[in-house]
Amino acid sequence: MAKSSALPDHLYEQMEVGQRLRNQGYRGRFAPSPTGPLHLGNLCTALVSWLQARLANGAWLLRVDDLDQPRNRVGAVESLQQDLHWLGLEWDGPVVFQSRRRGIYNSFLSALRRQGKLYACRCSRRMLADISAPAGRHLVYPGTCRDLELFWGWHEGRLPSWRLRVSKEFSHTSGDVILRRADGFIAYHLATVVDELTLGISEVVRGEDLLDAMNAQLALINAISERPVIYRHVPLLCDDQGRKLAKREGHAGLDSLRSEGLGPSHVVGWLAASQSLVPFGAELTAGELLSELKKKEGVLKSVLKP
């Protein structure tokens, strides 16, 4: 990897470590937030991500996205680990906690600012809500504050957010990406991209609800690295009303299924069937499902969307 002038030596070394890990073979990850019990949609993504890594004889990491402390729930980290163990989805190495990596996120943020790739933005959520997006499209920030050279510190009782000046190729797909929120929290996109690059993640398999995040993350990767990360997306599970499963809606997790007497093979079979990997009614462990898919080349990849 060619050394980037944007990065001081210690960050360049972190990127080199990530590249060496990536060169050793496939590295995937599952990255839940500890905001409540995992629902079946989360578990389906975990299963498909685990299968993709194991079919490639690769590593599968567990990362806990716990930066947004006010939303975290006591006991959620232990609960999600127990659920993965129960399903037979074992991860490699120690669990990675984003809350313990704030130093490296802030270092990358400072490096990008020193290179002039960031600017202060004082657009409020209300102002952005007034910007209408085309039907069926996510909002692309129009660059309102890009050339204003606004003050970086407190002004009228609030801090600005910090945005990345994206290159022209991303201006219409992601817009300028927030890397530090106005409340001082590191933004999701920055933490995620830094982790993918420094932990050596070669491919991310995640829910289709994060498809809109891909362009913002690719724009940030483009700003700090020459090595792209591959993103693939799992179709969402929906309830009877066609709504995607969500923690805030209280959709079913493993506790309710276990209370009905269902075992891991029932749940793994149902999750696999929901993605057309096996027929409905099949009962098999995660290991047995992996063995079956090894006999059916390309079946899992047909499920995943770019």
Curated annotation (Swiss-Prot):
Name of the protein described by the UniProt record: Glutamyl-Q tRNA(Asp) synthetase
Residues reported in the UniProt entry to bind L-glutamate: 29-33, 65, 188, 206
One BP term from GO: tRNA modification
Pfam families reported for this sequence: tRNA-synt_1c (PF00749)
Disulfide bond annotation, renumbered to this chain: none
GO molecular function terms noted in the UniProt entry: ATP binding; glutamate-tRNA ligase activity; zinc ion binding
Signal in keyword set: no
A single Gene Ontology CC term: cytosol
Cofactor(s) the record lists: Zn(2+)
Motif ('HIGH' region): 32-42
Keyword Metal-binding: yes
Function: Catalyzes the tRNA-independent activation of glutamate in presence of ATP and the subsequent transfer of glutamate onto a tRNA(Asp). Glutamate is transferred on the 2-amino-5-(4,5-dihydroxy-2-cyclopenten-1-yl) moiety of the queuosine in the wobble position of the QUC anticodon.
Name of the coding gene: gluQ
EC number of this enzyme: 6.1.1.-
Entry-linked HAMAP family: Glu_Q_tRNA_synth
Cofactor binding annotation: Binds 1 zinc ion per subunit.
Motif 'KMSKS' region positions after renumbering to this chain: 244-248
Homology family: Belongs to the class-I aminoacyl-tRNA synthetase family. GluQ subfamily.
Residues engaged in binding ATP: 247
Entry-linked SUPFAM superfamilies: Nucleotidylyl transferase
Keywords from the named record: Aminoacyl-tRNA synthetase, ATP-binding, Ligase, Metal-binding, Nucleotide-binding, Zinc
Sequence positions that bind Zn(2+): 121, 123, 141, 145
